[in-house]
């Protein structure tokens, strides 16, 4: 053998010896890296949290879904499950009870749903939290909807936009109708009327300002007036079109709002007005809030009034769909107040 080959063999044996010594001595193991601050931060200050810090930051709660589903040892602390400690059958969940946001990012198949979302849904049910789940594939409704309803007594509502005919109802006017019904039964109940007006204003603003933008420049008047006019129409519909013996079904929904605005665009032959909205408002008492909300549109010119009503119709066009109406025209299984 030449001297070069012998030298290379010796170098290789030396490297193997160093690697073996490092491996068996444990010097290169991550387990031997201590959470010890080095220097004055010139090499960085990040480090792993100690067990004491973890216990101080998070609540360690035994994760026992088998017992929870029997109604036993239900957790009292509400929060997000961010991790776990322990071994099989003795797992303690790390629960953050602060008012925080959590973003889970991972590649396909890493367990975002099975190992993160499902444990959080189980814990939310056990601790009594209301939650909204965006379920584009339908897995959550199939896998955990029945669990939440059967074992924890939850009221589950599924809004299925893929198959609206099998979806639960979601009437946008549910709360407005409810509080307006209370007002009719108790005319002096100002709190109920105030809530009906509040929810009508919220709904109108959401429909008119769909992108959440409130600055329309020179057209700002038309959008503000459209918002007030839509609020007025919603309140009128909720107050004067309740179910009766002739029409026992609920007719107060967003499609009826569109139809009423469309009908009010027609000229009033009796009052000889270019639209029927002004004569309708004249029949209301001067102190009626619907008349106040529509004040900006009522005091404008006929051309501006037509533009305002056209703006309302254009915003309501998004709700005109035969399938979508199967969801929007039926009372909600739950409302925002029940959810909260």
Question: For the regions a protein language model found, what residue spans apply to each?
Answer:
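Basic- and hydrophobic-enriched, low-structure N-terminal and domain-boundary segments
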Residues: 1-110, 114-122, 127, 165
